């Protein structure tokens, strides 16, 4: 199972965003005024300013996540979100040494449901690991031996995004039509944010959710799964209101 952890983020993120927003409106704004920004100031100004559509201020808060145990299929989708920073576990320098197929690869549930097919997958993956290790033992450097590894191999990656890019990411990847693995990662990222009292309010204020939450309707209405809107809104509201 993939593990997602919010490891770091901008100190006093909502106060930082509010302080940045007020530079345009507040005649008494100064560098020193940051220390005077209170929770009341945040609640008074931030929802209103975001309601005007002034979302560039969200870029002043950044969030760093650690993601462990997803496949390279997932990270190939993740890094398409270019306004972000990524550092991924290297297959060039780190040798894959797990013997357990389940610990080494992500196998979709659709494969596991077919017992015969599942056993064939595990057999091929075990042979892949064996040949990979044999290649290294025969003097092939891991940067070449890795060519045999499939996209299903588990990996680790650190992701840093600003809040505006996170909103864009969530809009696409929390959707029921997103690929299942990156959708799971996206929901866990949002859940990690919801655990923090100093972050949770922004989830609703900035509508950090799938596009049906952001727009108020599904932009892919003709392709929408039955009952999707109601199910997604209920799930999102539960996360947005959850506490650590």
Swiss-Prot record:
Transmembrane segments: none
ThyX domain mapped to chain residues: 2-207
Gene3D superfamilies: 3.30.1360.170
One of the Pfam families matching this protein, by short name: Thy1
Record-level GO BP terms: dTMP biosynthetic process; dTTP biosynthetic process; methylation
UniProt enzyme class: transferase
A GO molecular-function annotation: flavin adenine dinucleotide binding
Residues reported in the UniProt entry to bind dUMP: 77-80, 88-92, 146, 173
PROSITE patterns the UniProt entry points to: THYX
Pathway: Pyrimidine metabolism; dTTP biosynthesis
E.C. code: 2.1.1.148
Cofactor: FAD
Inducing or repressing factors: RNA-binding protein that probably controls the regulation of its own mRNA.
Swiss-Prot/TrEMBL catalytic activity: dUMP + (6R)-5,10-methylene-5,6,7,8-tetrahydrofolate + NADPH + H(+) = dTMP + (6S)-5,6,7,8-tetrahydrofolate + NADP(+)
Cofactor note: Binds 4 FAD per tetramer. Each FAD binding site is formed by three monomers.
Binding site for FAD: 56, 80-82, 88, 162-164, 168
Short sequence motif named ThyX motif, residue ranges: 80-90
Keyword field: FAD, Flavoprotein, Methyltransferase, NADP, Nucleotide biosynthesis, RNA-binding, Transferase
Active site: 173
Family the UniProt entry places it in: Belongs to the thymidylate synthase ThyX family.
Quaternary organization: Homotetramer.
NCBIfam families: thyX (TIGR02170)
Its job: Catalyzes the reductive methylation of 2'-deoxyuridine-5'-monophosphate (dUMP) to 2'-deoxythymidine-5'-monophosphate (dTMP) while utilizing 5,10-methylenetetrahydrofolate (mTHF) as the methyl donor, and NADPH and FADH(2) as the reductant.
Name by which UniProt lists this protein: Flavin-dependent thymidylate synthase
Organism: Pyrococcus furiosus (strain ATCC 43587 / DSM 3638 / JCM 8422 / Vc1)
């Amino acid at each position: 199972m993939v593990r997602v952890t919010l490891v770091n983020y901008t100190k006093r993120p909502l106060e930082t965003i509010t302080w940045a927003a007020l530079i345009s409106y507040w005649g008494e704004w100064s560098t020193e005024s940051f220390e005077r920004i209170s929770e009341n100031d945040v609640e008074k100004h931030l929802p209103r300013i975001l309601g005007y559509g002034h979302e560039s201020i969200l870029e002043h808060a950044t969030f760093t996540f650690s993601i462990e145990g997803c496949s390279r299929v997932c990270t190939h989708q993740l890094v398409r979100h270019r306004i972000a920073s990524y550092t991924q576990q290297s297959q060039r320098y780190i040798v894959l040494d797990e013997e357990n197929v389940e610990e080494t690869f992500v196998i979709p549930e659709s494969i596991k449901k077919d017992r015969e097919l599942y056993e064939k997958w595990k057999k091929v993956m075990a042979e892949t690991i064996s040949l990979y290790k044999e290649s290294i033992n025969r003097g092939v450097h891991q940067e070449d031996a890795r060519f045999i590894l499939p996209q299903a191999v588990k990996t680790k990656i650190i992701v840093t995004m600003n809040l505006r890019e996170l909103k864009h990411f969530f809009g696409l990847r929390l959707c029921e039509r997103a690929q299942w693995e990156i959708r799971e990662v996206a929901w866990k990222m949002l859940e990690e944010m919801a655990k923090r009292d100093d972050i949770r309010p922004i989830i609703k204020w900035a509508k950090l959710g799938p596009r049906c939450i952001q727009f108020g309707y599904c932009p892919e209405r003709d392709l929408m799964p039955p009952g999707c809107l109601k199910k997604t809104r209920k799930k999102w509201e539960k996360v947005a209101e959850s506490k650590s």
